[in-house]
Amino acid sequence: MTQFPQTLRAGATALALVMGLALPAAAGEVIAAVAANFTEPAKEIGALFTEKTGHTVTYAFGPSGQFYTQITQGAPFEVFLSADASRPKKAVEEGYAVPGSDFTYAVGKLVLWSADPARVDDKGAVLKTDLEHVAIADPKSAPYGAAAIEVMQKLGVYETLEPKLVTGKSISQAYEFAATGNAPVGFVAYSQVIGKEGGSSWMVPQDLYKPIKQDAVLLKTGAEDAAAKAYLDFLKTPEALEIIRKYGYVTE
């Protein structure tokens, strides 16, 4: 069985002390596994959550499939914010999460993006040109990668592009491949490029891929943790929803 470090909780407390946060006596800590595409909004939400409640959050960011495997192997996560809806539901079904605690916190959007301002037009025609590489997230563990495959199949370009795919272990790595020029274009989350200057992009039409519903769930390890429950409740507040929408997600 995989062994996980037990220093995450101590690290959160130490960080709070270093930052000079005044934590109330009842303040707690929550350890959250969060899909890589949600990194920036999660950080902003976490800071506001601490400000409002005194509870601290320790985040781990990465591919949802990898997190699910770690959860089944005893990782100390208390909250799971997945990039899909299936894994949180599976966590409930297999006894790793609290029944009835899963909900959709965001619906993601897929974009084809390039660091080159002239590379991608607003119809994605570049996919039918002689591309050297196309970056995507691993479709086996990252829902945005699976969505990218679906798009290419529906456009009839997958067979041509499959040998040219550069696969990142997460959507963050797929973005890095495109941002650094290791791939001229890449399928990334809209949240990763919204508000960024430079580059060019094509917002992939929603009818080319299944909705990327991103669900959160309370894991059994956090079932009795007031901070973990409070964090999930906070995700549903108007303040948190405003942050989520600011990063280009749709909320239900």
Swiss-Prot record:
Annotated binding of molybdate, by residue: S64, I171, Y190
Enumerate the CDD domains for this protein.
Answer: PBP2_AvModA (cd13539)
Question: Pfam families under this entry?
Answer: SBP_bac_11
GO cellular component terms given for this protein? periplasmic space
Q: Which superkingdom, per the lineage?
A: Bacteria
Gene Ontology terms: biological process: molybdate ion transport
Q: Which Gene3D superfamilies does the annotation name? A: Periplasmic binding protein-like II
Q: Which UniProt keywords apply?
A: Metal-binding, Molybdenum, Periplasm, Signal, Transport, Tungsten
Chief location? periplasm
Q: Which GO molecular function terms does the record list? A: metal ion binding; molybdate ion binding
Question: Family per UniProt?
Answer: Belongs to the bacterial solute-binding protein ModA family.
Entries under NCBIfam families matching the protein = modA
Q: Cite the record's note on assembly.
A: The complex is composed of two ATP-binding proteins (ModC), two transmembrane proteins (ModB) and a solute-binding protein (ModA).
Any idea what job this protein has?
Involved in the transport of molybdenum into the cell.
Q: What name goes with this protein?
A: Molybdate-binding protein ModA
